[in-house]
Amino acid sequence: MSFETKLEKYARLIVQSGLNVQEKQTVVISASIESYQLVRAVTKQAYIVGAKEVVVHYSDEEVTRMKYENMEVEDFNHVPTWFSSFRNDYALMNACFLYVDDEDPEMLAGIEPKKISNWQRAVKKACKTYFDLSDNMTNAWCIVGGATQKWANKVYPDMSNQEALDSLWNAIFKAAKIDDEHDPVELWNQHRRSFEKRVNYLNSLNLKKLYYKNSKGTEITIGLNDDYLFAGGGSYLKNGVYNFPNIPTEEIFTSPNKDDVEGIVFSSLPLSYGGNIVDEFYLRFKDGQVIDFGAKEGYEVLKGIIDSDEGSKRLGEVALIPYHSPINELKTLFYNTLYDENASCHMALGIGFSECIKGGIDMDKKELFEKGVNDSLVHVDFMMGTEDLMIDGILEDGSHVKIFENGNFVF
């Protein structure tokens, strides 16, 4: 199968399953200029299913780097009105949003972390309408991968440029279940059904806590909210439309009780954040809050994440992914959270999910917070799963039920 045919299948999957574009709906795409082939393919498929308009916002990594090198720290506290209006206005128009995750993992290496954290915090505040409508399941959004040269060279450093780029595209296609024989949309419908048994079982247990332990030193107990819900695969929006926010996805996840986390967790894979790498780090929690942390690489970046606001010191997500997931079986370190988080159990600092508590999508931020769901301007996933990870569920009477053994589900 030619690259063009694979790209067409991938684009169709993104439009029909990732975003589930509805007739007369506007589609907004954000991508780097290197991803123009994928953007054009998605645009074509979106119009085929009846999109009203496809709006594309391109970025250039070299220009972005120059911006961070030359602007002052305080300049990153200001978001231009055109930028915030672009997101907020299209969100109010019930547009759906596609993000092509294609950046160089080290695009902003060496840049003062305060510049990065200031900009990300300012964007969250200025684009509050957009983020609120995404968080409360009003607008569909989807993040997908697109191979670019610098990212490919980081993942496959011993290959030529073309070999590395081809290899990364092949890994992206394989992770998205793109092959010669099958309709990818139907494969993802089957994938959706594969989550249901485990999600339903976890929701039936009435768990009070999760207990994690592995040989890296992780030993942590995480409380769950009274009305917790696990979710997995895709999500139902308020209007009943089902979409997959991430392609690929292998995770089953929930939002824990923000005030009930005790113990220490060690990372198992590098974290690529804001164009920087954070590696070999740990977080220690007491009463739900990070009280100590360290990192062999990227300490200041990690500190910037944790210090973003009050909620960035607490967990908003725990996600269960078997060690032998299809993504991990690729035996590739992607230096990209979208892919690496689906190869490993992970947790996230920052905001939790409204869909992870009963009735949550109809609650406002204050109500969710009172129910125990964390709130923050950030949501940063980090990988902590290992081949020997053990996870027990703890019931109300204190008894344990096995969830994970040797890195994989026991059911």
Go through each PLM region and give its residues:
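Extended hydrophobic packing segments that form well-structured cores
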Residues: 366-411
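Dual-mode signal for accessory low-complexity, basic/Gly-rich regions
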Residues: 292-361
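A short secondary-structure junction signal
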Residues: 109-111, 153-157, 233-235, 276-279, ...
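Long, well-ordered mid-to-C-terminal structural blocks that present hydrophobic/aromatic surfaces
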Residues: 253-310
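Short solvent-exposed loop/turn micro-motifs enriched in small/polar/acidic residues
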Residues: 12, 203-205, 258, 274-276, ...
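Short linear motifs in exposed loops
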Residues: 223, 293-294, 404
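Active-site lining segments that contact anionic ligands and/or coordinate catalytic metals
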Residues: 260-262, 278-280, 287-290, 313-317, ...
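Active-site bordering "gate/hinge" segments
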Residues: 1-262, 393, 399, 409-411
